[in-house]
Amino acid sequence: REEAEIPSKIVIFIDELNKYGSKDVPKNSPILRQLLDITERGRSLGIILFAAEQFKSDIHDRVKGNCATHAYGRTNAIEISKPDYQFVPPVYKSMLTRLKQGEYILQNPVFRSLLNIKFPRPLYKQFKNG
């Protein structure tokens, strides 16, 4: 390929990250090695990783440590009692157990506090007679 044909940014989406980037995955796993490389060097290479998982506490520390933005959906009290959530103020911990579908709490170093966001309902669900 010629340089002009290579995209300047590559976006990778991974669902169920805990299957591939868990603390329990063997250290010699080729998928884990690639994930660590992407999370540790990806930004400088123009690679953006979006990952989703049910339990942040299960994810490898080096993967979590290189994530700038975290979006938290509804979770349970057992999960928020883990050390990964020790920085979360009690009011937000309480919110995390009661979030509705489409509601998230965002954490990013740019913001001084956590943000509660709500995605709008799809247009076809907003009206009874559609």
Question: What do the PLM-derived regions correspond to, one by one?
Answer:
Residues 1-95:
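Conserved P-loop NTPase motor cores
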Residues 101-130:
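Conserved P-loop NTPase motor module
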